[in-house]
């Protein structure tokens, strides 16, 4: 079920709500300049 609210939520409230639903989010970001890899983004969601 998707919950919609009219009030704005902080990032902490959103993460708390997601964790209460039993969802695990793994997010990994890497940005390099001298090593040339400017952006790498990896995300995994486990329900």
From Swiss-Prot:
InterPro entries: Gas-vesicle_GvpA-like, GvpA, GvpA-like_CS. Keywords: Gas vesicle. Pfam families: Gas_vesicle. It is found in: Gas vesicle shell. One of its GO terms (molecular function) is structural molecule activity. One of its GO terms (cellular component) is gas vesicle. Its main location: other. Gas vesicles are hollow, gas filled proteinaceous nanostructures found in some microorganisms. During planktonic growth they allow positioning of the organism at a favorable depth for light or nutrient acquisition. GvpA forms the protein shell. The gas vesicle shell is 2 nm thick and consists of a single layer of this protein. It forms helical ribs nearly perpendicular to the long axis of the vesicle. Belongs to the gas vesicle GvpA family. This is Gas vesicle protein A. It comes from Dactylococcopsis salina (Myxobaktron salinum). The gene is gvpA.
